[in-house]
Design a protein with these regions (language model features):
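An acidic- and aromatic-residue-enriched active-site/binding cleft used to recognize and process polar
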Residues: 16-19, 51-53, 80-82, 267-269, ...
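An extended, acidic, His-containing surface patch that forms the Zn2+-binding/catalytic region
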Residues: 184-398
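Short glycine/proline-enriched loop/turn "hinge" motifs that connect secondary-structure elements
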Residues: 4-6, 65-72, 136-142, 254-257, ...
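Acidic/histidine-rich catalytic neighborhood of metal-dependent amide-processing enzymes
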Residues: 1-68
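Flexible loop/turn segments at secondary-structure boundaries
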Residues: 20-24, 54-57, 85-86, 154-157, ...
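Midchain, well-structured core segments that form catalytic/ion-binding scaffolds
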Residues: 38-246
């Protein structure tokens, strides 16, 4: 504002709410940005956020500028077991044992980190695990649900689904093998004849479940699921995660096949990763602008720029995958997509922006000791923002 005559270009400011929840503010802003882009013939260069950043590990003295952002999926396992009375425990199949095996296999396992250009996501971690038994009784649970927070740098929804289907198949079979070992030992101890337990490891995606049920019910299933989805949307006592689970439970309940199975699907929300690879002209321009801003800023802080903002943010909605197969897998395996959960995918694809975060530095986010470092936050970060913006807008960047 002190040198307006030197400023070339435009800044569009969006004040968005709900970033910590479902990004409702950003998801409402995206269509407006896309509309302005078309009607005003604007050429957007980048999407900038000023979200909080902190040390990435104990003793980390770096102050980061992030070009790109991590993505988030929530692969979910709806596990159908076989109910039985606790007095006949080997006649049933406990779904909790299967979810426990999956947790042991996946939770915080670096095998499932996503790596791009040497930058590594945090491994998946459990966000919900519970059985669906509504009350206490001496009957074991019939079903259970489990989902993970799964961070991505380059993996797509269809790839993560395929990976998790493989995990579910592996873990289900391990549970069956373990149960048969335990049952054999029990039979020997109690002098009973051993007969191998009848369970088969079966896994399918939500899309495959839907196809199987539709083969039995025909096109009537589409209307039934739409009506159920709208009824779930009308309920104010449950959130989107629960709605998705209840819809899967409903569709499975319509199927004639009642044998144990694991249904793998995606629970909302979905945050696409934005990988600024440097292949497009916009990518190259943003990377150059940030590099010049970082190298020209005189400070005692060690400034470092990295490819992925490591925390979930609204930056994810500045772009979306364009491969129709990826979008198809996302929609068909996210229960309720288009009714109680939706994304402005076409507008996100139209924006297709490289993104960056230059924010305040602080510690202990979401704790009563949360605080910021004043000098970096109010002196250095604003300078980096200013220089990056000016570098992008000027033909002769400073």
């Amino acid at each position: 504002s002190q040198s307006v005559e030197e400023f070339e270009g435009n800044l569009i400011y969006g004040a968005v709410c709900d970033e910590e929840g479902n990004s409702g503010g950003m998801l409402n802003l995206v269509p407006k940005l896309a509309k302005m882009q078309e009607e005003e013939h604007l050429e957007y260069l980048a999407l900038l956020d000023t979200d909080y950043m902190t040390s990435e590990f104990p003793g980390d003295e770096n102050k980061y500028v992030y070009v790109g952002t991590v993505g988030k999926l929530m692969p979910t396992f709806y596990v159908v077991g076989k109910e039985t009375h606790v007095g006949e425990s080997f006649k049933g199949l406990d779904p909790n044992q299967i979810t426990a095996q999956i947790i042991s296999r996946v939770n915080l396992n670096p095998e499932f980190c996503d790596v791009a250009e040497g930058e590594v996501t945090l491994p998946p971690i459990t966000l919900r695990q519970r059985d669906m038994k509504p009350e206490y009784s001496c009957q074991i649970a019939k079903s259970a649900v489990l989902f993970f927070n799964y961070a991505t740098h380059c993996s797509t929804p269809d790839q993560v689904l395929e990976r998790m289907v493989g995990v579910a198949q592996e873990c289900f079979q391990q549970v069956i093998d373990t149960l048969n070992q335990h049952y054999r030992t029990f039979c020997n101890m109690s002098r009973r004849p051993y007969v191998r337990l009848p369970w088969k490891a079966r896994v399918m995606t939500y899309q495959e479940l839907y196809t199987a049920v539709k083969a039995e019910l025909g096109s009537a299933l589409d209307e039934m699921v739409r009506e159920k989805s709208e009824a779930l949307l009308a309920r104010q006592d449950i959130d989107t995660r629960v709605r998705a689970n209840m819809l899967v439970e409903y569709v499975h309940g319509l199927w004639s096949d009642k044998d144990p199975i694991v249904i793998v699907y995606l629970t909302p929300p979905y945050y696409p990763h934005v990988y600024v690879e440097g292949k497009s002209e916009k990518d190259k321009a943003l990377l150059a602008a940030v590099d010049k801003a970082v190298t020209s800023t005189q400070t005692d802080y060690k400034l470092v720029y990295k490819k992925f903002f490591p925390y979930i943010s609204d930056l994810s909605y500045g772009a979306a995958p364009k491969d129709p197969e990826i979008i198809r897998a996302l929609k068909r395996n996210t229960p309720g997509f288009g009714i109680f959960y939706d994304l402005p995918l076409k507008e996100m694809q139209a924006l297709d922006l490289p993104v960056l975060d230059i924010g305040p530095f602080g510690k202990d986010a979401h704790k009563f000791t949360e605080r910021i470092e004043k000098h970096y936050t109010f002196e250095v970060a604003p300078e980096l923002v200013y220089k990056t913006v000016m570098n992008l807008l000027h033909d002769d960047p400073q």
